[in-house]
Amino acid sequence: MGSSGSYLKSGGFTSQEWEQVGEIKSVKILRKIGLKKDATGNLPLYGNTPGTAYILLKPNGRFHQFRQYGEDRKAKFDIDYGRHNSAKPYLHMHTYSGKDRPEPMPITNAKGDIINKSLYEKYKGFLKGIKL
């Protein structure tokens, strides 16, 4: 799958650090090779295929992150389920500006109320194990 770092001169990425462990709606579910059993991490900053997306699940199989890549293979936006500055996890979106990931745009609140219905409807099929 690639690493979260450098391109090789011959094309593609440095040594493989990710493996595919499944799919949801034709989007590959990735797992970082060698990650501690209870750790999750984040998806790579670059995708192997222009315009692709990947999904990362928590070790218990629940949704953690969806990352969409642009035609330049760089991360475009993330949909995350986590406690970003909150006591309870909530669904939120980060869009990338260069390598920066600005403050999240909530899709749900910590109570599970849907705030951005159009984004929720578009991505709800990827939210394995998330109960709102």
Predicted regions and their residues:
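Catalytic toxin/effector domains delivered as secreted proteins or via bacterial secretion systems
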Residues: 2-132
